Amino acid sequence: MILNTFNLQGKVALITGCDTGLGQGMAVGLAEAGCDIVGVNIVEPKETIEKVTAVGRRFLSLTADMSDISGHAALVEKAVAEFGKVDILVNNAGIIRREDAIEFSEKNWDDVMNLNIKSVFFMSQTVARQFIKQGHGGKIINIASMLSFQGGIRVPSYTASKSAVMGITRLLANEWAKHNINVNAIAPGYMATNNTQQLRADQDRSKEILDRIPAGRWGLPQDLQGPAVFLASSASDYVNGYTIAVDGGWLAR
């Protein structure tokens, strides 16, 4: 039965940045599909833990700054110590800094690049080594952006980092397919999250954005649940190196 290919019963998903918003939505969606969750955050994700355990799945909460790559191996070791394996990695942790390019600071550049792309690569590397050790392959889901496809304004390091996410997704897929590792990405459109709070608070800018989205609304965390489950499951075994836009039709305009 086709629905069985989406069943994640017995799988373990490691998700970075799942205390709120899109990360929380994906964590809950994966849990509902059968995954136990390892959540890596800088704060205790109390609400996410409640939602995951409410559907009968286990949740291991780990605290770390993902931009410090020296701690990545320990995170995977703790996940394996608790659950015996890792099957899925979702690289969701990320930040954005807004400032005109002409004034953009080195700190705002480095902070964003270190978390949004450097940590994505090195966490993927660490988890891929575990996948290879386990001998059964695995699934890596990176979180890209509309600004993986477009330039945007006033977010130079974010645009650069998310363009890089789409590129590194392709490279890792090319190199690791031989190990039965699928590396894909999801590019959310304009979503109602903390990252877009300033945009949504600006009535003129919000209207301008909504007027371009064929769906006529801001995206919600649950809009990423289906794509995340698909990319984490055997239903996507022949999908590799691809970035799926979940944008209400934004890129079609």
From Swiss-Prot:
PROSITE patterns: ADH_SHORT (PS00061)
GO MF annotation terms: 2-dehydro-3-deoxy-D-gluconate 5-dehydrogenase activity; 2-deoxy-D-gluconate 3-dehydrogenase activity; NAD binding
Enzyme class: oxidoreductase
Binding-site residues, NAD(+): 14-38
Pfam (any one): adh_short
Pathway: Glycan metabolism; pectin degradation; 2-dehydro-3-deoxy-D-gluconate from pectin: step 5/5
Reaction it catalyzes: 2-dehydro-3-deoxy-D-gluconate + NAD(+) = 3-deoxy-D-glycero-2,5-hexodiulosonate + NADH + H(+)
Keyword line: NAD, Oxidoreductase
Active site positions: Y158 (proton acceptor)
InterPro entries, A to Z: 2-deoxy-D-gluc_3_DH, NAD(P)-bd_dom_sf, Sc_DH/Rdtase_CS, SDR_fam
EC number(s) on file: 1.1.1.127
Binding site for substrate: S145
GO BP term, example: pectin catabolic process
Function according to Swiss-Prot or TrEMBL: Catalyzes the reduction of 2,5-diketo-3-deoxygluconate (DKII or 4,6-dihydroxy-2,5-dioxohexanoate) into 2-keto-3-deoxygluconate (KDG or 2-dehydro-3-deoxygluconate) with a concomitant oxidation of NADH.
Assigned protein family: Belongs to the short-chain dehydrogenases/reductases (SDR) family.
Identification of the protein by name: 2-dehydro-3-deoxy-D-gluconate 5-dehydrogenase
